[in-house]
């Protein structure tokens, strides 16, 4: 692998530290939670020159105290001043490392698939600079700082504070939202999920391995010496909560999150290679209901796209995926423009990693899920030296999948009969209204016998003679819908008695037959798996008495046959409609653009991206029961009753800190669950937290609740003047007008991820 010199002595300059300080100052509300500039303004220009020279010589002294944000709230001590200096140095190091690894990892040493999939983990800076600062000379390895042209123009930065704020907010606040956004476009036929949490036990072995990662790309060992000092002082650590945004660690440690992603990057490469070699998207085979036109497409596919002539069953080895990857792409394009239904075998894996949390979506059998689980967990233990816990496998139809504190559910698209079942109650109500109007009309008529004859005549001949009349068409539709629901079995026996077209009846029969074949296929796989397992167990007993080489070879052949039996790993998909083919084709292109250009304000989108956004197969919901338990553990709600109480943990702090802590928590909740469908129901929990804040203030001052209302008003306003109003808690008007996805991040507060991830 090609190595280059990172050359810390040339990169760390006073201009770089000045830019790091200026960027933190513009984005200080995201990281520090203070409302004064006393610490930022106390840093002089000479400090940048002195610090850069000390870092180059290796004499810079790092603070020995962990970063605590609550110390910042109380006073501006010398200890906090040293911690701020460390944040400036840490941010400067991150600027160098991030852009260096963009070029070295994702351009020279990676294939195209890995580059596309992982480029969003590190490439945040370049697109924002290119958009906001088009005249700025920028390099992938490291953008140069020009003393006279850019850095000393303080007015330029002051006029572009929004750019710096957008840069920090998009990079560090929307990674979880991007993970949920990616899950929305997974395949709708996913049947099983697997969640996993990696235990971050950082020791000497991991530190040496991280050092070896640096040595692969650079021979500048002096750079890692400075990083090793940070690890020894616990200022940077990938095994602690420093990787999360929280209220206890000064926002977060940016280097800790970066090093964790860099360390687990090899695991992402392993997953990409495994998916590329083992999994396939679709394989065709001929079905029972094959018409002449369908058989033509089938024969055309066998001749042009698939190298093997397939009859009833076929096997696909992993190496065929590499040889015929282009043909699989062409077959998707071919069937895109032909509205034909065909049947497929499918086997694919979808996954998303957020720091040390992973979720997998499987389009395969359960045998393949356990096979993949053993492979990946073996890789984590033996290659990355990481352990794991909380490995759970969920069925998408029965179980509630929870990832990052959010429920994942299907965005179901109902067919004709499912709509009738869902709306059965509505149909019955309409039917009762029609009967009521019918009875009222009967009473109004004088000649009941004459009316009954007319009504029976209309009822028998409403279709097709009087179909255009609104009342009779509604009556006919709802009565027939109700009959279909009640006599579903008779619907398939006496099809000529119903008004539905023949094509719909034929397609319905086809769907039910394919559902039955799917069930029989799964049953066949299970019986075959049990049979092979029994054979292996019997051969184990036989080998205990005989150790002939032929027996060993036969045993190995049976074991390999069971291991490489593709039918046991595939998922049988009987219905692969034109809608799903076309949208999957578009979503494949959309996923490419998402991984390449996410967080870049929608730049460089292809033709398919804008159309694919409306086809989302998964929804997210707030788990209110889990969230209620979290509120009780944090002390906002009574442990046994459903009512707010005063938080005992905050009684010793000042009122300003209490108000800010409650507001910080509420904004974190609104940020995290802004993507959920039931986001509007969070208003009730926000009001509970508001009442808990009032009760906490009353308990601290030993006053009545009316006293807190009179002092801080109902919106918890800390101070109010003619020109400025300081309020850390969202107002009631803001909460009432808040809608889903309309709230992203408030400029005054950071995001506390430890509430949802622990």
Swiss-Prot record:
It is found in: Plastid, Chloroplast. Keywords: Chloroplast, Plastid. One of its GO terms (cellular component) is mitochondrion. One of its GO terms (molecular function) is RNA-directed DNA polymerase activity. One of its GO terms (biological process) is mitochondrial mRNA processing. This is Maturase-like protein 2.
